[in-house]
């Protein structure tokens, strides 16, 4: 911080104290409680604006959950981490700050820095890595970037929220060393390196205590030990105890308007259960946030002028390609590598796979944003081949993994009509899809929770195909479904066993009727929902969906068609993907298999076309049992809105695939270090201790499909020299290929016979280098002191472990290029 920055920080602190002095107990308690789904109340008397928060992390959804309010959609966090480039993450953060400012958002509810403990974790795609150091480095870049734009961040979910099953109550049982060395480590690094203005405490418990009430981890570790001075907000609906939460260091209970704070908190102070000073501490943290983001009069915002504009589409495209990981690239008939494709050669490309046309650009749950446009692989390749090469493109579905109904979308034109008990219309609005997601006051003009008795989703559907179309519902309550003017289903959906309050959001779709329709002949559709009485609920919301699934063709027939297309083509590109029902917040995965018949499709195509390139569109690891049978495999994660354009850039060789794996890809699910995420009697034991990710594969001598850090670019690198001290590592390398490229030099430490219980090796540092063909570069990489430390449980402190270490300069965890020996005193 410069002197000028420090002086401004001081002025902000004065403004905060002055504002705090003017507030009475009731107003203070009110400020700590959400006024609605996304904001805190304004307090005009002290010049405080309403602070607005929004998800995060790949875009800024804003306060409305609808495609009517679009946001840029960047690649999934796994893709961002795969770039191994904190500076790039910082640029992503700056773009998101720009989006937040545009939408009047002061605080982004991101980044998610829980770890890839098990590949089953439903929010795996939303977290960065299995490695705490890489997670901390990328997370620091991201936080710095968002805050460079004057917008706050909320590092989440503090801590131990590494899976979704029973997430509201699960007790993550984590021993002190893994807690410190693995799960807390990214949070600690981000607090130290990026000074985040906020943190979100998780739903779960850690070692018996609910995280929103965790005095030790919040007050002692996060605040006293690490010096965190931002605000602490509960995950949505996580705050459950007035006294427990305020004494546990929770500043803000979200969402509102009814929370355990507000009047209940003022009451607890009056009853002598809570000292008023605890309320003051929380208010101070909130006012400090307001001062930083420019929402408190008299306090200079950290960033007063909006930074220079950033081209969102261009950055989204660059980020996507930088995160794509080329895990396999074999030579094909002419002796050259399968990728990049020879754009000048002409010929035919057969593009296959449902996700090539209907791209999966983001993962499900609160990470969902609505981009203004989506470039699918089909869109991206069609225009690139047209503009940049003589090749022709054919497209065939091949296999469709979405066997489940999804919100009515393509071909539907829908609106919502709200009626009162007498049937009179009280409100109306257009709907971008069949999904109704109205939260708080975000209702169609005229409608209110008090007057609405029913909501009809109604309009027309123009079928894209002949045959049996399935219609269905998601949500809880009474429905009537009509197609073509006829009632095809009427019934009530009760709450299932899994009482997740977001059931209507994440719950399984239900098929209700099948109707035979003709391509191009429009038909009327209507789904009427009886509105339950939500007026007494702490959070008023209406969520339900009209679902649809087009005619399903015989899987064998689809594969046979794809095989014909592949046989006739010079190159086959198969896009395989997970679905919304596989990767989402709200539930965990059951296995790592690609859904539907996609594995069969790849095998059948590879059998007839030796130049088969498989593009994997998944946010987390999936099994690739055919990986040795195809010429190339490119992992694209959830690539964000510009994914298809970036894919064309990479396939045609305009851009190098820049990614390295941020997480190990197992050959088969059974090899994953942690294969169970279902708690036993409410407890989830982190029994593997320090051994997650590559640390576990190494300890158990299991060879993964692709190791941590692996990724091929379009050039080769010769590592020439390595010098190591306890502080720095100096590596010299040469680009020996024919193209410019970027290499991620990964530094691992491996202790030699030290008798201390710890992994055989770990990532200590890394750096990206760039060089043209034939050029050499030298990089000096700082080794953080923490890389040599372990947490001493008895002394409750960090202990430096001296002795002999092998220092490795590596292309990946499985590909060490040079080693040096270091004796640490
Ligand atoms: C998620 C948070 C998110 C919040 C608000 C919760 O269900 O766990 O990550 O920020 O909802 O959407």
Annotate each predicted stretch with a short phrase.
Residues 1-793, 797-813, 821-824:
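Glycoside hydrolase catalytic-domain context in secreted enzymes
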């Amino acid at each position: 911080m410069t002197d000028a920055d420090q002086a401004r920080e001081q002025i902000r602190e004065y403004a905060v104290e002055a504002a705090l002095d003017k507030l009475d107990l009731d107003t203070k308690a009110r400020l700590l409680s959400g006024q609605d789904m996304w904001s805190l109340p304004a307090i005009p008397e002290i010049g405080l604006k309403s602070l607005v928060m929004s998800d995060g992390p790949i875009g800024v959804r804003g306060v409305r959950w609808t495609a009517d309010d679009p946001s840029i959609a960047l690649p999934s966090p796994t893709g961002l981490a795969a770039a191994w480039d904190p500076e790039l993450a910082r640029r992503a953060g700056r773009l998101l700050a720009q989006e937040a400012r545009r939408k009047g958002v002061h605080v982004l509810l991101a980044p998610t820095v829980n770890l890839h403990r098990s590949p089953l974790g439903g929010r795996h795609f939303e977290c960065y890595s299995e490695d705490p150091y890489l997670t901390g480095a990328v997370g620091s870049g991201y936080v710095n970037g968002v805050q460079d734009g004057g917008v706050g961040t909320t590092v989440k979910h503090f801590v131990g929220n590494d899976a979704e099953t029973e997430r509201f109550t699960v007790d993550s049982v984590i021993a002190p060393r893994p807690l410190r060395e693995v799960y807390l480590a990214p949070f600690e690094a981000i607090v130290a390196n990026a000074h985040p203005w906020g943190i979100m405490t998780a739903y779960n418990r850690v070692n018996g205590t609910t995280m929103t009430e965790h005095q030790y981890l919040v007050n002692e570790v996060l605040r006293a030990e690490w010096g965190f001075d931002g605000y602490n907000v509960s995950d949505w609906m996580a705050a459950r105890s007035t006294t427990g939460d305020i004494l546990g260091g929770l500043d803000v209970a979200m969402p509102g308007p009814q929370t355990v704070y507000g009047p209940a908190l003022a009451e607890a102070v009056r009853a002598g259960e809570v000292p008023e000073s605890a309320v003051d501490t929380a208010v101070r943290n909130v006012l400090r946030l307001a001062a930083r983001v420019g929402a408190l009069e008299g306090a200079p915002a950290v960033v007063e002028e909006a930074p220079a504009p950033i081209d969102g589409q261009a950055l989204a495209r660059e980020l996507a390609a930088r995160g794509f990981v080329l895990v396999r690239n074999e030579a094909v008939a002419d002796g050259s590598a399968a990728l990049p494709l020879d754009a000048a050669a002409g010929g035919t490309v057969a593009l296959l796979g449902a996700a090539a046309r209907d791209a999966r650009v983001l993962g499900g749950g609160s990470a969902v944003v609505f981009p203004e446009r989506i470039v699918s692989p089909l869109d991206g390749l069609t225009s690139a081949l047209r503009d940049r090469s003589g090749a022709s493109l054919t497209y065939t579905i091949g296999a469709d993994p979405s066997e489940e109904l999804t919100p009515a979308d393509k071909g539907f034109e829908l609106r919502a009509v709200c009626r009162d008990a007498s049937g009179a219309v009280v409100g109306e609005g257009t709907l971008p899809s069949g999904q109704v997601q109205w939260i708080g006051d975000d209702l169609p003009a005229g409608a209110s929770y008090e007057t609405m008795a029913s909501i009809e989703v109604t309009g027309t559907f123009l079928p894209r195909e002949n045959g049996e179309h399935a219609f269905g519902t998601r949500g809880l309550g009474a429905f009537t479904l009509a197609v073509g003017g006829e009632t095809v289903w009427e019934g009530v959906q009760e709450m299932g066993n899994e009482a997740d309050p977001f059931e209507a959001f994440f719950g399984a779709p239900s098929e209700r009727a099948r109707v035979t329709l003709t391509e191009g002949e429009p038909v009327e559709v209507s789904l009427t929902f009886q509105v339950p009485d939500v007026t007494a609920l702490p959070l008023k919301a209406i969520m339900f969906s009209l679902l649809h699934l087009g005619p399903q063709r015989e899987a064998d027939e689809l594969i046979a068609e794809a095989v014909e297309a592949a046989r006739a083509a010079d190159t086959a590109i198969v896009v395989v993907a997970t679905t919304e029902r596989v990767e989402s917040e709200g539930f965990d995965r059951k296995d790592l298999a690609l859904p539907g018949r996609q594995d069969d499709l790849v095998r059948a195509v590879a059998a007839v076309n030796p130049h088969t390139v498989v593009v994997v569109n998944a946010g987390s690891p999936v099994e690739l049992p055919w990986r040795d049978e195809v010429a190339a495999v490119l992992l694209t994660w959830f690539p964000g809105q510009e994914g298809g354009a970036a894919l064309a850039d990479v396939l045609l060789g305009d851009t190098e695939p820049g990614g390295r794996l941020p997480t190990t890809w197992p050959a088969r699910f059974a090899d994953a270090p942690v294969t169970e995420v279902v708690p036993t009697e409410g407890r989830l034991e982190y029994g593997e201790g320090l051994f997650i990710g590559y640390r576990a594969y190494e300890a158990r001598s299991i060879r993964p499909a692709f190791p941590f850090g692996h990724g091929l670019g379009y050039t080769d690198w010769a590592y020439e020299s390595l010098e190591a001290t306890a502080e720095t590592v100096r590596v010299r390398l040469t680009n020996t290929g024919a193209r410019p490229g970027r290499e991620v030099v990964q530094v691992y430490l491996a202790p030699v016979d030290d008798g201390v219980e710890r992994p055989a090796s770990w990532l200590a540092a890394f750096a990206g280098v760039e060089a043209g063909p034939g050029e050499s570069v030298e990089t000096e990489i700082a080794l953080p002191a923490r890389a040599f430390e372990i947490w001493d449980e008895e002394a409750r402190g960090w202990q430096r472990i001296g002795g002999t270490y092998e220092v490795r300069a590596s292309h990946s965890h499985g590909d060490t290029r040079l080693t040096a020996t270091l004796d640490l005193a």
